[in-house]
Design a protein with these regions (language model features):
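Hydrophobic, lipid-facing positions within transmembrane beta-strands of outer-membrane proteins
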Residues: 50, 64-68, 78-82, 114-118, ...
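Outer-membrane beta-barrel architecture
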Residues: 63-67, 90-92, 129, 173-177, ...
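Transmembrane beta-barrel strands of outer-membrane/channel proteins
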Residues: 68-72, 95-99, 132-138, 178-184, ...
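Outer-membrane beta-barrel channels and translocator barrels
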Residues: 88-91, 125-127, 137, 171-174, ...
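Flexible loop and strand-edge segments within Gram-negative outer membrane beta-barrel domains
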Residues: 102-109, 113, 127-210, 248-251
Length: 271
């Protein structure tokens, strides 16, 4: 699998364990870091195919910057994004929003998405700073199946949210971070039906969540050396059910919660 991180925090569906690409929007990103190849030793089994880390935006220069982008193209495709970035003394903020839609190049292939992101930061001193952010996005997607085997009413209604908080320190010979993150999702999916079949009598629903606390401190004791110690805790899980359309009855599916934690010490020396 491929692990996606936002500011170092894992991002995937807490019940099924897979990433959700439509929740990772360009309006969040200052830059994207890519680690190619297996990285399970550092990041766990989800990183067998590599790691993508999205680093969120921050206003570095004093003042206010506003930006708006609008694009329109084939198949009634619309892409919009606006952002406001502020840096005033020790305080900084980023607020962004976006709306995107398309009819798709085939019937029953519509896609619509809207979302918003906000980040606030404060520098207590040259060495200590704190920041927190929140992102919520909702998208509606339709899947027409293949041309040979079309699908009807295969529609998804998905809402994803994330929030995080971090306290950071940066000194000449040591640096570290204490951070908290919380991700959640609400999914409503109609699996659709093929030609000759009857429409679905129930729809899939799920709620999932993932949260964690991470602490590490890294220090350079002498030339070429770096020692890092830390602790990670993660909780993830959720529940799923099918809702019967005729009666509103809820048929339970999976209800699972898991916790994991680990401490570590890493010693490196350049030779």
């Amino acid at each position: 699998g491929l692990l996606v991180l936002i500011d170092g925090h894992p991002q995937y569906m807490g019940l099924m364990g897979h990433p959700i690409a439509d929740a990772y929007q360009s309006m969040l990103a200052e830059r994207v870091e890519v680690l190619r190849g297996p990285a399970s030793v550092l990041y766990g089994s989800n990183a067998m195919g590599g790691v993508i880390n999205i680093v969120t935006r921050k206003q570095q220069e004093e003042g206010v910057k506003n930006n708006m982008q609008v694009g329109y193209g084939s198949y009634n495709t619309l892409q919009t994004e606006f952002s406001n970035r502020v840096k005033k003394g020790c305080f900084s903020s980023v607020v962004t929003g976006s709306y995107n839609r398309t009819d798709g190049h085939r019937p029953d292939m519509e896609f619509e998405q809207y979302g918003g992101y906000a980040k606030l930061g404060y520098d207590f001193s040259t060495f200590w700073k704190v920041w927190g952010d929140i992102n919520v996005t909702h998208f509606n997607a339709s899947n027409p199946g293949t041309v040979q085997t079309p699908l009807f009413d295969n529609d998804s209604r998905i809402t994803r949210g994330m929030t995080s908080f971090a306290l950071e320190n940066h000194y000449e010979k040591t640096s570290g971070t204490l951070s908290f993150f919380y991700n959640w999702g609400r999914h409503k999916i109609n699996d659709g039906y093929k030609t000759g079949e009857e429409p679905q009598k129930s729809h899939f629903n799920s709620k999932d969540r993932m949260l964690g606390i991470s602490w590490y401190q890294s220090a350079t004791l002498f030339t070429g050396n770096r020692v890092t110690t830390g602790f990670d805790y993660q909780h993830f899980g959720g529940e799923s059910w099918n809702k019967v359309l005729a009666t509103g009855e809820r048929k339970s599916g999976v209800d699972k919660q898991m916790d994991e934690f680990a401490g570590y010490i890493d010693f490196r020396q350049d030779i």
